[in-house]
């Protein structure tokens, strides 16, 4: 396995570990999710160019669009929680249930 692929898989694993460990604040969870999406984007781009699958060239861009939408929704939720409750604890997400 190429060292760049190993580094990207390690970056994804560390970001996933960060999501599992830093669950108290929503901002740290969102940052770890963005790290996961960025490492997936770079890994997907490198694998497509390495295996010459140019018919799948739009897949990383679609992943990037979904990542931007996820970041926008996450930041909107962060603003809503922090203005309503004064903090960004993930445990406040249970209060948003209908």
Curated annotation (Swiss-Prot):
GO terms for molecular function: NADH dehydrogenase (ubiquinone) activity. Keywords: Electron transport, Membrane, Mitochondrion, Mitochondrion inner membrane, NAD, Respiratory chain, Translocase, Transmembrane, Transmembrane helix, Transport, Ubiquinone. It catalyses: a ubiquinone + NADH + 5 H(+)(in) = a ubiquinol + NAD(+) + 4 H(+)(out). It comes from the Eukaryota. It is a multi-pass membrane protein. Disulfide bonds: none annotated. Coiled coil: none annotated. Its main location: mitochondrion. Pfam families: Oxidored_q2 (PF00420). GO terms for cellular component: mitochondrial inner membrane; respiratory chain complex I. Its EC number is 7.1.1.2. InterPro entries: NADH_UbQ_OxRdtase_chain4L/K (IPR001133), NUOK/Mnh_C1-like (IPR039428). The chain crosses the membrane at residues 1-21, 28-48, 59-79. It is found in: Mitochondrion inner membrane. One of its GO terms (biological process) is ATP synthesis coupled electron transport. It is an enzyme of class 7 (translocase). Belongs to the complex I subunit 4L family. Core subunit of the mitochondrial membrane respiratory chain NADH dehydrogenase (Complex I) which catalyzes electron transfer from NADH through the respiratory chain, using ubiquinone as an electron acceptor. Part of the enzyme membrane arm which is embedded in the lipid bilayer and involved in proton translocation. Core subunit of respiratory chain NADH dehydrogenase (Complex I) which is composed of 45 different subunits. This is NADH-ubiquinone oxidoreductase chain 4L. It comes from Perameles gunnii.
